Amino acid sequence: MEVNNKYIRFDWAVKRMLRDKANFAVLEGLITVLLGETVTIVELLESEGNQETSNDKFNRVDIKAKNSKGEIIIVEVQLTRQLYFLQRMLYGVSKAITEHIEIGQLYDKVKKVYSINILYFDLGKGTDYLYHGKTVFTGVHTNDQLVVNTKEDEELRMRLPHDIFPEYYIIRVNEFNNVATTPIEEWLDYLKNNHIKDDTSTPGLKEARKKLLYMTMTDKERRAYDAHMDDIMVQNDVLETAKSEGRAEGRAEGRAEGRAEGIMSIAKNLKSMGYGIVDIMKVTGLSEEEIMKL
């Protein structure tokens, strides 16, 4: 019989616990399962989301790490809807590339980047909970894949473009409804339901069973964590209610005005609950001026 342990949510752990080198194994496990190869994190790099703030209800949480091969891995957790999320993914990867090459260095110093995005909102249409994107150059007339010459260790070698270009992983947590039987499914079960099997051997999760137990937190940490969970529950309730109202209005009117009013309804509800302008802008995509007029 399984012990019903309570585990700390991943977004909280990423922001406050997994940056500790003693806990790298949890994050390494997730990346290992996704990439299909053993990954060792050498160090964490500065990232925009590693600052702790009191008002982080809608903040993204991210970690930027370097592995033993010198590659850069970005792990981002996003709790709420972003209108231009793909553009932000691209910007984050581009910034990581340019930050880690000096002016005047040869292009062979450009680092491979992996962008892992864990989303708790509806990004769009799609039936899977895991999507993988990589760059492939396909012949327009021959349909073959281009292989390029590169110089490594003073030798010319053949490489596929996707060995050089960034790779993207999108994990749509809310779309996971499977029974967890594979390592990636066990990870999704934890990300969505905070559940970890007692007998798990999945990389990262066997370490998480020991390191991410709710009962190991101090009283102060528990109070902060419980408040965070309450914020998420209220936020989800407000957003779901407002989205339902927007859908109903859209169906009734059959016009774009209905969808626009739904967004306005979300903004009004969030504003009445005391959320800041910046947070409301992130959720709804409205401008500061539009929100101020509500």
Locations of the language-model features?
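Elongated, amphipathic alpha-helical interaction scaffolds
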Residues: M1-L294
